[in-house]
Amino acid sequence: MTKTIPRIGSRRNGRIGLRKTGRRIPKGIIHVQASFNNTIVTVTDVRGRVVSWSSAGTCGFKGTRRGTPFAAQTAAGNAIRTVVDQGMQRAEVMIKGPGLGRDAALRAIRRSGILLNFVRDVTPMPHNGCRPPKKRRV
């Protein structure tokens, strides 16, 4: 006999979703991708499955304000708030990109109360691979 899945929403408004069960995650990995235009924070478990994510754009910042340190701090706080409620205590931080939100996101992660095992910079650096695009003339 199959187990019934609880549904939320109604058929009339067309929004039917499956309710997620909150699992306990004691340890995870926090990925911070900081570009000049936006900052994306993704929290995964140790196996790499996404638990929570947030970006400066989803936090309500639009246009050039998405690249600011304050927007990165807000995005990191939003992504981590949900996993702290699920019981995450330890995490590893992987920071990628040259953006302004790198330090602000890391500061928000440290303030959240999660113990950090290590902070690693995983920005991809070419060993003189592809030719870069030509410089902009403004």
Swiss-Prot record:
It is found in: Plastid, Chloroplast. InterPro entries: Ribosomal_uS11, Ribosomal_uS11_bac-type, Ribosomal_uS11_CS, Ribosomal_uS11_sf. SUPFAM superfamilies: Translational machinery components (SSF53137). Keywords: Chloroplast, Plastid, Ribonucleoprotein, Ribosomal protein, RNA-binding, rRNA-binding. One of its GO terms (biological process) is translation. GO terms for cellular component: chloroplast; ribonucleoprotein complex; ribosome. It comes from the Eukaryota. Its main location: plastid. Pfam families: Ribosomal_S11. GO terms for molecular function: rRNA binding; structural constituent of ribosome. HAMAP family: Ribosomal_uS11. NCBIfam families: PRK05309.1 (NF003698), uS11_bact (TIGR03632). Belongs to the universal ribosomal protein uS11 family. Part of the 30S ribosomal subunit. This is Small ribosomal subunit protein uS11c.
